[in-house]
Amino acid sequence: MRFIDEAIVTVKAGDGGNGIVSFRREKYVPRGGPDGGDGGKGGDVFVVADDNTNTLVDYRYTRRYDAGRGENGHSKNCSGKGADNIYLRVPIGTTIVNNETGEVIGDLTEIGQELLIAKGGDGGLGNTHFKSSTNQAPRKATSGFEGELKELKFELKVVADVGLIGLPNAGKSTFIRQVSSAKPKVADYPFTTLVPNLGVVDVGVHRSFVMADIPGLIEGASEGAGLGIRFLKHVARTRRLLHILDIKPIDGSDPVENGRVILNELERFSPELANLPQILILNKIDQVPDADELNELCLHIVAELGWTGAVFRTSTLTGAGVDDVKYHLMNEIEREQEREEEDPMFAQAQKERFERLEAEVRLNTEEQKEAYRAARRAAREAAFNNELDDDDDDGVEVVYAP
């Protein structure tokens, strides 16, 4: 199934039914009072987090959803039937944004979580409500209220504890295959990973966390180059970033410069994202069999990058060092979760930090998209102008017969 992480839809809640004008008509009661019922309520529109879907592809093809209208009122003071609500199922991790105002309506992060996105209109009043001491037979009823109409953007961000970042072919997909049951495509060419992959990492009984692998970043990614920047928003919810660095790139490039590329692109795209705790994984140590040479190379990379955080040496081919990373991540995540439970101030600070991070990532993603669209428009216009300037008749005198 095609992976779609954004969709724009229009939702229309149902209008309320109309109240009616009606009077009692019974034998021996020729002048019965008013008995017009109220209109029924229009249907609401909800979104529901569903763990059976992982893409917004359905909303690329059906872009409008209308709830039903409430029934009109009936005689004998019977109200019209309310319309059924409609429920739009989205993957866990979907954010609902008002596309016209940019306001975030809600975030669906738990299975079965529901969010009201468009409220149905209330039904109109029947003439029973307008009876008074001076008007015993009112001929007045009101129409139902209109349901809400909204244009919304659905934004999917995968829900993961750890995000993998790095250049293409750094070994991210092989790493997630090694530590989880995820089976992303692995090959010897760049951009093998085209969409985010999720894997559940089991560390022990009732101990696990979720890891996300996104397409590799390249230099210029923050300006729209490559695939990774489009999916960088998917690591905005993570607690840790795992920076996978190939210490012996097959193309002969400098691993230090490769590491700087990722750090620079991350900082340029989102300083808040760059401030997330990062762990450096010096990968493919099996490519340097000499222990002294390997140690010297790893120390050189760490020193040149000025890295002060945790560092691990791994081989995703042989599995060396991978378990150490798993246990370290699990312990860090559990320690942070326990502190959030025990310290309300820390929990609130974490919540505010993630809100700032998501807002910054959303803004920067939209700006990058606009810049990319503007560049494409400029390229098309330039190509069109070049075609107009390409005159095959240059230097040829054309004489028109009378």
Swiss-Prot record:
Residues 382-402 are annotated as: Disordered. Residues 160-334 form the OBG-type G domain. Keywords: Cytoplasm, GTP-binding, Hydrolase, Magnesium, Metal-binding, Nucleotide-binding. Its main location: cytoplasm. Pfam families: GTP1_OBG, MMR_HSR1. Its EC number is 3.6.5.-. It is an enzyme of class 3 (hydrolase). Residues 387-396 have a biased composition (Acidic residues). Monomer. PANTHER family: DEVELOPMENTALLY REGULATED GTP-BINDING PROTEIN-RELATED, MITOCHONDRIAL RIBOSOME-ASSOCIATED GTPASE 2. This is GTPase Obg. It comes from Psychrobacter sp. (strain PRwf-1).
